Amino acid sequence: LGKLKSEILMALFAGTFENRIDRKGRVSLPADFRAELPADGPRVVYIYPSPRGTALEACGRDFMQRMSDSIEQFDIFSDEEDEMTASIVAAARRITIDTEGRIVLPPELITDAEIVDAVTFVGRGGRFQIWNPSDYFNYAAEARERSKGRTMRLLPLEGRDE
């Protein structure tokens, strides 16, 4: 792990896309998202139920490793470590992206996210979410309303005072 933060190039998932699921449970991962995954090595994503609602969370291997490492910062055998491991690491499914850019959503994850015949992919920076489209539409409208008037501060670029 001896890389500096600035040397690690993480995926940046951005945008919102809706795709239909076929009879076999396959759905095309948006091309913009596929482009963010490493070109060398296995083309996989890790998908698990969101701890914050009915969406699914998804990420590449690097982000999943960061989450696992972060969970290991809790005291071993603590309630926090146990709960986070059970709800994220143990619940995650390693999903291979086929040659046509599709993933197969396991039935239990489809049920968890209340998905029927289409999904909305939502970029979240280093990870993305998979939603039932109507649930995401409602969530996004509420989030936009709550965020009105809020501001944020950008992190400074490394090595520069801003």
Question: Where are the regions that the model predicts?
Answer:
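Flexible "stalk/tail and boundary" regions
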Residues: 1-18, 23-26, 33-95, 99-100, ...
